A protein has these predicted regions:
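Hydrophobic ligand-binding cavity/cleft-lining segments
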Residues: 1-41, 150
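Beta-strand elements of well-folded, non-transmembrane domains
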Residues: 12, 57-59, 109-113
Length: 150
C-alpha cells in the first residue's frame, strides 16, 4: 500500500492549523491533485463531516467520499474514503512547537480487488503526487518541511 508522510512546521498555533487541515474544503487550496470539494454532511470540520473530493485520475476526474473517522481537536483528524477501486486514508496530527505547531499529514492509498497487484506501480507515482501536495501544503501553512515532528 503506497504511503506518503510530510511534517510541516508552521507559525500557526495548533488550534488554527488543526481547523484549517480538518476542513477538507481546504484540500483544493493546497493539493494540486484536487479539483473540487463539496461538503455533503455536517457544516465545516467535525466528527460528522462528510466530503466529496474530486481528484485528478488517469482517465479524468474521480470523486472520493471522505467520512470523518476520528476528530480529536486540536490534535488528530482522520478521514477515510472507500470505493470499488481504492481505499484512501488521510491522517492529520498537530502538535505544539513553540509559538507555532508541527502538522503531520499522512496519506495511505490501497487498491482494492485485482487492482491490488499494481500497488507497487502506484507507489512510484504516489511519491510524486505526494511531493506536489506537500509543496502546496507548505505554502498554505506558510511553513517549512521538517524531517520529524519532534
Amino acid at each position: 500500500m503506497p504511503r506518503y508522510v510530510v511534517h510541516v512546521r508552521t507559525p500557526m498555533p495548533p488550534a488554527e492549523a488543526f481547523a484549517f487541515m480538518a476542513d477538507l474544503n481546504n484540500f483544493a487550496r493546497w493539493d494540486p491533485g484536487v479539483d473540487d470539494v463539496d461538503q455533503v454532511e455536517g457544516s465545516g470540520p467535525g466528527p460528522e463531516a462528510v466530503f466529496d473530493v474530486s481528484v485528478k485520475a488517469v482517465l479524468g476526474t474521480m470523486t472520493l467520499r471522505y467520512e470523518t473517522t476520528t476528530y480529536e481537536a486540536p490534535k488528530l483528524f482522520v478521514a477515510r474514503s472507500q470505493s470499488t477501486p481504492l481505499t484512501s486514508l488521510d491522517s492529520i496530527s498537530v502538535r505544539s512547537d513553540g509559538t507555532g505547531s508541527v502538522v503531520t499529514y499522512e496519506a495511505e492509498l490501497t487498491l482494492n480487488g485485482l487492482l491490488r497487484f499494481v500497488d507497487p506501480v502506484l507507489g512510484l507515482a504516489f511519491g510524486r503526487i505526494g511531493d506536489r501536495a506537500a509543496g502546496g501544503l507548505i505554502e498554505a501553512l506558510d511553513g517549512e518541511r521538517v524531517d520529524s515532528p519532534t
